[in-house]
């Protein structure tokens, strides 16, 4: 994922910063505890596409 893109996109729920999880190909919002999928190098920033992070994943 392009680091320049990460600088301009934000969580659609809280507008907070997103962190790219390369291993799982997801964008993580630590504030809302949500993971947004990245498909074919395109972030899917739809709340209904996000999954909630488990307690173990948040560490």
From Swiss-Prot:
The record's GO CC annotations read: cytosol
InterPro entries attached to this UniProt entry: Trm112-like
Identify the SUPFAM superfamilies for this entry.
Trm112p-like
Gene3D superfamilies recorded = 2.20.25.10
Query: Pfam families, per this entry?
Result: Trm112p
Give the record's family classification. Answer: Belongs to the UPF0434 family.
Identification of the protein by name: UPF0434 protein PMI0721
């Amino acid at each position: 994922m392009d680091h320049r893109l990460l600088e301009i996109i934000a969580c659609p729920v809280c507008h907070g910063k997103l962190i790219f999880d390369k291993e799982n190909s997801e964008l993580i919002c630590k504030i809302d505890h949500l993971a947004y999928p990245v498909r074919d190098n395109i972030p899917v920033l739809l709340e209904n596409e996000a999954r909630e992070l488990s307690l173990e994943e948040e560490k």
